[in-house]
Design a protein with these regions (language model features):
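Structured, contiguous alpha/beta core segments that scaffold functional sites
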Residues: 1-57, 61-261
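Surface-exposed loop-to-helix/strand elements on domain peripheries
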Residues: 219-234, 256-301
Length: 301
């Protein structure tokens, strides 16, 4: 008796794994996730979610307002001009941006040879990590790398700087500002932390729709391979690999389903999986994600 049962294999793509928030103690410093990756996750959510980015940008602009002002309105006074020379409006705005996006900020404090304040420069917080705290729980230094994912490569080696108040002479120091978070010794989470899954969801929905449209409004494809059920696992794996190489570029559909069929004289076929109601399926979730993002940011009115 002929066996016409099918061996089905599902190929999935573009699964994103959220980085684990974990403190890694290595060589005297602490990283916020593997290779300091949690900051990258926050950055991706910021740029990937339309609603989340709009709310963050609004808060940043509200916090900055018109910037710092001279209390007597004398913007030409020597003291005010000296202050702006030390701490520019651009650095002020960047520090506020880091504080909103990352929940903390860092600045490079540069003294003169006479130990007076010379310059306050913004340092992107994603590039600055604390040293391991001493026995009293004090963080006496910070480490800087242009890219922590490349910390072992030449030009990206971490450099240690004293924390503000711990430098000797005219050493450049680093100041990190962050609010108190329960259970957090080294890092402070942004105040919108519960928003992140919904921000990620908005990004994935946008990517889904884009790929859905580029793929001719198809959810994916079924590749029917006739007279292939008797193939060995090695032969099926080899065929599956070829299909992946040919059909699964970044602009293709979500999934490819390979069907290894029984005896059949028909040629191999590719069937498109259609869904005329795909846009309706995501309407509720899209609205819900937007509402949860606004709620998480306390921007409900």
């Amino acid at each position: 008796m002929q066996n016409n049962s099918r061996d089905l294999r599902l190929i999935s793509f573009n699964k994103y794994v959220r980085p684990e928030i974990k403190e890694y103690k290595h060589k005297g410093y602490v990283l916020n996730g593997v290779n300091n990756s949690f900051y990258n996750y926050l950055t991706e959510c910021y740029y990937g979610s339309t609603t989340h980015k709009a709310v963050c940008d609004t808060y940043i602009n509200l916090i900055y307002g018109q910037g710092l002002v001279e209390k007597d309105g004398d913007v030409e006074s020597a003291e005010w001009l000296t202050f702006l020379e030390i701490f520019s409006e651009e650095d002020q705005h960047r520090i506020i941006s880091d504080f909103k996006i990352y929940g903390e900020f860092s600045a490079q404090v540069i003294p003169t040879r006479g130990k007076t304040l010379s310059k306050i420069l913004h340092l992107e917080k994603s590039k600055v990590v604390p040293s391991v705290a001493d026995d009293l729980g004090n963080i006496t230094s910070y480490w800087y790398s242009k890219d922590w994912s490349k910390q072992w490569q030449q030009g990206y080696e971490p450099v240690e700087y004293p924390a503000m108040g711990h430098g000797k002479g005219n050493e450049t120091e680093i100041y990190v500002g962050k609010p108190y978070n329960v259970g957090k010794e080294y890092f402070s989470d942004p105040d919108y932390l519960p928003v992140l899954p919904y921000a990620e969801f908005e990004q994935e929905v946008a990517n889904y729709y884009l790929k859905y449209i580029k793929n001719g409004l198809s959810l994916g494809n079924i590749v029917n391979v006739p007279n292939s059920q008797h193939w060995s696992s090695e032969e099926k794996d080899k065929y599956e690999k070829k299909v992946k190489e040919r059909l699964t570029g970044s602009d293709n559909a979500n999934q490819v389903l390979i069907s290894f069929n029984g005896a059949d004289t028909s040629p191999s076929t590719i069937e498109s999986i259609k869904n005329d109601y795909a846009h309706k399926q995501w309407d509720f979730l899209t609205v819900e994600a937007r509402q949860q993002i606004l709620t998480g940011h306390k921007a409900t009115s």
